[in-house]
């Protein structure tokens, strides 16, 4: 009787160890499929050009050399003041107390970056 229990126990132990190794192999294949094969495919995959990054352009602001030109100056400073009033979240009462001398010059490139990142 003890011999039968020993054989059954040994058979169960062997079957459990084989099942565990199959799970490990299956897990390795899943991991390889997620990381290894995908990485190889991406190397040969056609990428979008920066001009076709529509979703990124709407989220982060359009990326171009001119959008990062911080040396932008304008002859008419009223455009910058109007832009500041239009885009600010300050109350009209507070804005009424502000003088034009305190308003900093803000280039469109800075506004474009801020609009792309935080909306509005």
Swiss-Prot record:
Stated name of the protein: Neuropeptide-like protein 38
Protein localization: Secreted
Keyword Secreted: yes
Function: Plays a role in several types of aversive gustatory associative learning including gustatory plasticity and salt avoidance learning.
Primary localization: secreted
Residue numbers of Tryptophan amide PTMs: 35, 60, 118
Gene Ontology cellular-component terms listed: extracellular region
UniProt entry tagged with the keyword DNA-binding: no
Signal peptide start-end: 1-19
Top-level taxon in the UniProt lineage: Eukaryota
Organism: Caenorhabditis elegans
Propeptide: 20-24, 39-46, 64-85
């Amino acid at each position: 009787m003890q011999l039968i229990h020993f054989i059954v126990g040994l058979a169960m132990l062997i079957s459990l160890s084989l099942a565990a190794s199959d799970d490990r192999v299956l897990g390795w294949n899943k991991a390889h499929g997620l990381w290894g094969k995908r990485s190889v495919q991406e190397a040969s995959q056609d990428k979008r050009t920066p001009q076709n990054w529509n979703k990124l352009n709407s989220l982060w602001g359009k990326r171009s050399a001119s959008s990062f030109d911080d040396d932008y100056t304008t002859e008419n400073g009223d455009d910058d003041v109007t832009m500041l009033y239009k885009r600010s979240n300050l109350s009209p009462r507070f804005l009424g107390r502000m003088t034009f001398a305190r308003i900093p010059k803000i280039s469109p490139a800075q506004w474009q970056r801020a609009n792309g990142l935080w909306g509005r």
